[in-house]
């Protein structure tokens, strides 16, 4: 199979195809796509959990790429209408790399896929080696949403460890669905995170709201003002951005915590909000 007309209903497959040099195959994208910027000129055919089916069909795709159970209803409807659908379900760093391999094979550029994966693995190895020189690996709370508080998304937890931190709720990474990763704010207090990182699914992180949570004034990250924001496009898409820009931003945060400079080759293109 070598799909020539592809609709990507999430950003990470769009970005992957661009990195593989196969962007001309893309005929439709999610309206939430921001990476790469030039992809925004493609026809927008969906949000995240709903899609414009007639618009998709009018594009005559030979493949539609979806993600996880969250887009299962979209996938089912497209299949009923005779469209070929491939649903990815990558939740870990290894699975993200597998997704890139798979997509490269589908479009007939397996060697480019291997090179891209090798480049990302090399970058993460360099960050892990750099992090090994930190005097302290801070305890880290990552928030993917604020009300309710949701934490522990697997690939982010793994990237935190690569970048030099220690997740305070490591057990949550094995829960695939967000409702299973809801955290009682009171349960955070005894964990005493030294760093809090917010990435609230496209909404700007309100640091004052974090500081004002009941009992959180006793938390080290709040007392010492180690509260940071990483925009969701860099970290919450399970794709190339998280394994490059996202992990570099995490590394920059932990270097800042340790009062250390980041090696210029590991410095992110966009700095997190510190």
Where are these predicted regions, by residue range?
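N-terminal ligand-binding lobe of clamshell/alpha-beta domains
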Residues: 1-274
């Amino acid at each position: 199979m070598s799909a020539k007309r592809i609709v990507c209903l999430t950003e990470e497959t769009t970005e992957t195809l661009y990195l593989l040099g196969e962007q001309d195959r893309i005929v439709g994208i999610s309206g939430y796509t921001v990476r790469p910027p030039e992809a925004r000129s493609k026809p927008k055919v969906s949000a995240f959990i709903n899609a414009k089916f007639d618009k998709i069909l009018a594009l005559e795709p030979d493949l539609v790429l979806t993600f996880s159970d969250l887009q299962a209803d979209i996938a089912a409807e497209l299949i009923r209408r005779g469209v070929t659908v491939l649903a990815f379900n990558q939740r870990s760093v290894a699975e993200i790399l597998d997704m890139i391999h798979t997509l490269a094979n589908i479009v007939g550029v397996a060697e480019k896929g291997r090179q891209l994966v090798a480049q990302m693995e090399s970058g993460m190895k360099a960050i892990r080696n750099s992090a090994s020189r930190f005097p302290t690996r801070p305890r880290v709370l990552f928030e993917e949403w604020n009300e309710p508080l949701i934490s522990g998304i697997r690939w982010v937890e793994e990237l935190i460890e690569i970048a030099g931190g220690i997740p305070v709720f490591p057990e949550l990474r094995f829960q695939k669905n967000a409702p299973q990763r809801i955290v009682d704010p009171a349960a955070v207090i005894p964990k005493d995170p030294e760093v809090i990182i917010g990435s609230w699914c496209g909404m700007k992180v309100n640091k004052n709201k974090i500081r004002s949570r009941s009992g959180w004034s006793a938390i080290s990250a709040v007392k010492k003002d180690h509260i940071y924001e990483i925009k969701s496009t860099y970290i919450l898409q399970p794709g190339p951005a998280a394994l490059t820009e996202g992990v570099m931003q995490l590394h920059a945060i932990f270097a800042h915590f340790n009062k250390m400079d980041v090696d210029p080759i590991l410095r992110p293109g966009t700095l997190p909000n510190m």
